[in-house]
Design a protein with these regions (language model features):
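Patatin-like phospholipase
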Residues: 1-115
Length: 115
């Protein structure tokens, strides 16, 4: 709470805020964590996971709408959809899952910076 106001994460309304850098950066790179497909599940998600998944779906819709109108120079979309909401303890596995994305990003970013 700040000055009597409850604040929420800015990602709630602007989950991919590349547009805030328009005209202020030579190269804009955005990491989209909202568009990754979710994992197939056979168990019932918790109430918290249902709420969070709803937020992810809404965030994905916002990102898709934003990208339809404008785009950053590079959008990175790592395959994080296979992980669950509270899998922070799986940092090593999450980073390992991004290895394939890393090679593509290095190539594209190198081309952008060389231009």
């Amino acid at each position: 709470m700040v000055d009597g106001r409850i604040l929420v994460d800015g990602g709630t309304t602007n989950p991919l805020p590349f547009d805030t850098l328009a005209g202020r950066a030579d190269v804009v790179v955005a990491v989209d964590l909202f568009s990754a497909p979710g994992a197939d599940r056979t168990d019932m998600p918790s109430t918290w996971e249902c709420v969070y998944t709803t937020i992810l779906v809404m965030g994905g819709a916002i990102v898709a709408a934003k990208l339809a109108h404008a785009a950053p120079d590079l959008v990175i979309q790592p395959n994080v959809g296979i992980f669950r909401t509270l899998d922070f303890y799986q940092a090593t596995a999450i980073l390992r899952s991004a290895e394939a994305t890393k090679a593509v990003v290095k190539e594209r970013l190198g081309a952008l910076l060389a231009a």
